[in-house]
Amino acid sequence: MNPNQKIITIGSICMVIGIVSLMLQIGNIISIWVSHSIQTGNQHQAEPIGNTNFLTEKAVASVTLAGNSSLCPISGWAVHSKDNGIRIGSKGDVFVIREPFISCSHLECRTFFLTQGALLNDKHSNGTVKDRSPHRTLMSCPVGEAPSPYNSRFESVAWSASACHDGTSWLTIGISGPDNGAVAVLKYNGIITDTIKSWRNNILRTQESECACVNGSCFTVMTDGPSNGQASYKIFKMEKGKVVKSVELDAPNYHYEECSCYPDAGEITCVCRDNWHGSNRPWVSFNQNLEYQIGYICSGVFGDNPRPNDGTGSCGPVSPNGAYGVKGFSFKYGNGVWIGRTKSTNSRSGFEMIWDPNGWTGTDSSFSVKQDIVAITDWSGYSGSFVQHPELTGLDCIRPCFWVELIRGRPKESTIWTSGSSISFCGVNSDTVGWSWPDGAELPFTIDK
């Protein structure tokens, strides 16, 4: 092959390679264009679907929690959540809290709690045994999660609180201020909507558990006055965060604090704490017009702490060991009652659920079911009720649930702080089991040594 032929051959090969490369580039461009066109088309097609979904979510996100159903029939209690906040807080950033409670909308359940403006295992946790301080705030996080700065949202400045959802927005009630002039601040969807001033100037206080909503109205009970004598008690009816009606209970010789309230067939039942002279629990039930009835749980299975050994009950206050008390709850079923109580008669330890089929009206101490929740060797604390509406569960009844606070630290343990974790259970009509679900943290922490 002479030099000219070599040049022609090499040139031809280069030309072929160039043409092939050009065709590949053109093909690549066409492929990208087609792919982009398809994606763009899909995006255009998806936009109406996305908008429809968004609008649909907004439409179903606003309902009315009717509260007209009856409580679901149940045979026992299934464990619902456990946050392990103290165990996690030995190493992680977890709030120092007390008075946790749970409330559910038609979309979710949240744990509400009163912080001390401090984290566990930190210097600011010192002295947090104190109930009322300007640093306490109501916050909330998804149920079952340890309350931390990373998953919690601020709700209100408060050392006493309540919260509930009417199907449209969250209502929060936060009480703060001096003992002789505290004010409850009502917020609806995070916006201040109303206030309630202390009317007896003696530690205005509320439920420390969820308020109750029926047909768009929400209801709460507040106390103002002595913790060891006759005080004043009011029921408030609120709509979209504004007080529309209130009534003061005519209840001589009764003492109501820290009521646990729930809806049942369109009415509200509250089971409360008698800190004055009752080792059984007082109750108040009322309709949406605030027409009310009052009484004490008659059962000889006593629900408060401290309390005497079970015996003969009374439909009035049972005086032995009646002074002082602890927040608690019960669920009424006709003449029967599910009673939640500490296992110990004189300390906040252990927890159990008891079914007394005649206990709402009968004074004997017989019962037919006992389910263990926390062993007597482990600390418990406050407890309270909450419900899950049919709009959340899909059932045709209101599911009863409860939570138990598991207090750790002062005054019973050698720490500089007081805090707690929580567990919760919901009523079911299927198999359940009794056991012990304690807090489980090993104390003291590093900050305590």
Curated annotation (Swiss-Prot):
Cofactor requirements of the protein: Ca(2+)
GO biological process: carbohydrate metabolic process; viral budding from plasma membrane
Catalytic-site annotation from UniProt: 131 (proton donor/acceptor), 382 (nucleophile)
Keyword match Plastid: no
Compartment(s): Virion membrane; Host apical cell membrane
Region described as Head of neuraminidase: 71-449
UniProt-listed InterPro entries: Glyco_hydro_34 (IPR001860), Sialidase_Influenza_A/B (IPR033654), Sialidase_sf (IPR036278)
Topology with respect to the bilayer: Single-pass type II membrane protein
Activity regulation description: Inhibited by the neuraminidase inhibitors zanamivir (Relenza) and oseltamivir (Tamiflu). These drugs interfere with the release of progeny virus from infected cells and are effective against all influenza strains. Resistance to neuraminidase inhibitors is quite rare.
Region (Hypervariable stalk region): 36-70
Protein residues bound to Ca(2+): 274, 278, 304
CC per GO annotation: host cell plasma membrane; membrane; virion membrane
Virion surface side: 28-449
Alphabetized GO MF terms: exo-alpha-sialidase activity; metal ion binding
Reported modifications of this chain: N-glycosylated.
Sequence ranges on the Intravirion membrane side: 1-6
Documented EC number(s): 3.2.1.18
Region Involved in apical transport and lipid raft association, residue ranges: 11-33
Glycan attachment positions: 68, 126, 215
Reaction(s) this enzyme catalyzes, per UniProt: Hydrolysis of alpha-(2->3)-, alpha-(2->6)-, alpha-(2->8)- glycosidic linkages of terminal sialic acid residues in oligosaccharides, glycoproteins, glycolipids, colominic acid and synthetic substrates
Domain description: Intact N-terminus is essential for virion morphogenesis. Possesses two apical sorting signals, one in the ectodomain, which is likely to be a glycan, and the other in the transmembrane domain. The transmembrane domain also plays a role in lipid raft association.
Miscellaneous remark of the record: The influenza A genome consist of 8 RNA segments. Genetic variation of hemagglutinin and/or neuraminidase genes results in the emergence of new influenza strains. The mechanism of variation can be the result of point mutations or the result of genetic reassortment between segments of two different strains.
Family of this protein: Belongs to the glycosyl hydrolase 34 family.
Protein name, UniProt field: Neuraminidase
UniProt organism field: Influenza A virus (strain A/Silky Chicken/Hong Kong/SF189/2001 H5N1 genotype A)
